[in-house]
């Protein structure tokens, strides 16, 4: 594709609003020949609203010129333009754009680096693992968080020890939460590396981290986590209890029956539903009386789930 621009006369208007509408119309036409016009508006227009609009619409192009323009816009003087450029980079779908974006993942400016890593995560190119691993120890929390995201999406098992350390020791709760979720890429052979970190995360001071730990344990279903998950059924945050109930259902260990039956009386309907579902998965007849009570729950979703669990039990156990 050549980069010969077709110029809309409205772009010469002294009215920034007119120029912005022109940018929208040009983008809606989806004509590759108009790409230079959008790139030029992002680079050169004096009005913030025009540059911001150009950054927003350029996310639909994977051409190297668009990637370069968006990456450069991460250094724009206006925070709105920078934010739109970062969002647009995260919408890139063409893996070929990754080669243009890779150098920006090592940029000295943390916000630029984080945005580049976010874009690379969506593209899932193997070469992104190198700057991502380097960024795991960056001073900026947003950079560390995006680096974990890249490695998680790439399923980089080599990075699991470093990610496990972040899950338990990072000073930023959102980094710990993201790292805890990324530990779910572990294979059964890698459980020895990640299980201690997940059990520690299940006791984190931040409830979203604890919730993420229970969610990840539900994916990995290691039986060694049984006691920790039972303890999590007493967590102050119902969201953590819900994820723990899901994990216990997947473990299918009758030891969890008392905790799950107790959860059927929780005031939060979503938790009651998850407890009923878990009891059905475990398939123990001792849960029948509690499930029969839950089958008359005021919440229709709880009733439906409890009746399904009873049906499974009547057929001889979990599905």
Regions found by a protein language model. Name each.
Residues 1-10, 31-44, 63-75, 94-106, ...:
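Amphipathic alpha-helical scaffolding segments comprising HEAT/armadillo-like alpha-solenoid repeats
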Residues 9-31, 60:
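Alpha-helical segment of the N-proximal tetratricopeptide repeat
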Residues 14-15, 46-47, 77-78, 108-109, ...:
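Short inter-helical turns and helix N-cap capping residues of alpha-solenoid HEAT/ARM repeat scaffolds
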Residues 20-24, 50-60, 84-87:
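Non-membrane alpha-helical segments in proteins
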Residues 25, 57, 88-91, 119-122, ...:
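Core register positions within helices of long alpha-helical scaffolds
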Residues 235-308:
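Ankyrin-repeat and related helical/solenoid repeat scaffolds used for protein-protein interactions
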């Amino acid at each position: 594709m050549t980069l010969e621009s077709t110029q809309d006369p409205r772009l010469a208007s002294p009215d920034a609003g007119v120029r912005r509408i022109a940018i929208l119309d040009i983008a809606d036409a989806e004509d590759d020949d108009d790409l230079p016009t959008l790139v030029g508006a992002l680079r050169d227009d004096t009005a913030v609203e025009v540059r911001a609009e150009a950054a927003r619409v350029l996310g639909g192009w994977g051409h190297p010129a668009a990637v370069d323009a968006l990456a450069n816009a991460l250094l724009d003087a206006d925070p709105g333009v920078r934010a739109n450029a970062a969002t647009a980079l995260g919408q890139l779908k063409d893996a070929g754009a990754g080669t243009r974006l890779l150098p920006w993942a090592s940029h000295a400016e943390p916000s630029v680096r984080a945005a580049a890593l976010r874009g690379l995560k969506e593209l899932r190119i193997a070469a992104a693992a190198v700057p991502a691993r380097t960024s795991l120890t960056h001073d900026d929390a947003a950079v560390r968080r995006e680096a974990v995201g890249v490695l998680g999406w790439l399923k980089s098992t080599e990075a699991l020890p470093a990610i496990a350390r972040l899950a338990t020791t990072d000073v930023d709760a959102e980094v710990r939460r993201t790292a805890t979720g990324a530990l779910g890429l572990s294979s059964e052979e890698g459980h020895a590396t990640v299980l201690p970190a997940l059990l520690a995360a299940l006791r984190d001071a931040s409830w979203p981290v604890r919730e993420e730990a229970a969610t990840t344990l539900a994916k990995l279903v290691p039986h060694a986590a049984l006691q920790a998950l039972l303890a999590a059924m007493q967590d102050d945050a119902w969201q953590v209890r819900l994820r723990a109930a899901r994990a216990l259902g997947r473990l299918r260990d009758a030891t969890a029956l008392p905790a799950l039956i107790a959860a059927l009386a929780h005031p939060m309907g979503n938790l009651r539903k998850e407890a009923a579902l878990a009891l059905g998965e475990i398939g123990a007849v001792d849960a029948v009386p509690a499930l029969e009570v839950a089958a008359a729950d005021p919440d229709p979703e709880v009733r439906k789930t409890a009746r399904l669990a009873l049906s499974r039990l009547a057929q001889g156990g979990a599905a």
